[in-house]
Amino acid sequence: MHALVVRVTIHNVDRTRELLDSQVVPGASGAPGFKTGYWTWSTGGGEKNGLSMIIFDSEENARAVGDRIRAIAADTPDDVTLDGVEVREVVASA
């Protein structure tokens, strides 16, 4: 299994939640190899910082969704800044 880890800075909370609900979560959960996913945020320095971890059955499937998330973020620069996207091998779970 592989995890897609995404870090963002959120500028527009309402619009970001709308994007999560309408595009990001449905797109990830409907993607080939999807296992589970968690999207989180916290407030730090006046802006919200988001972190998600989405688990897939393979590195290839995780990378494909990472590419889609990059495209969504590129279309919404006023709402969210993509700070990082990486794929990691899952080495343990509970």
Which stretches of residues belong to each language-model region?
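Conserved hydrophobic residues forming the short capping helix/wall of the S-adenosyl-L-methionine
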Residues: 73
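Short S/T/G/P-rich N-terminal loop/turn motif that feeds into the first structured element of a domain
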Residues: 1-51, 57-68, 78-94
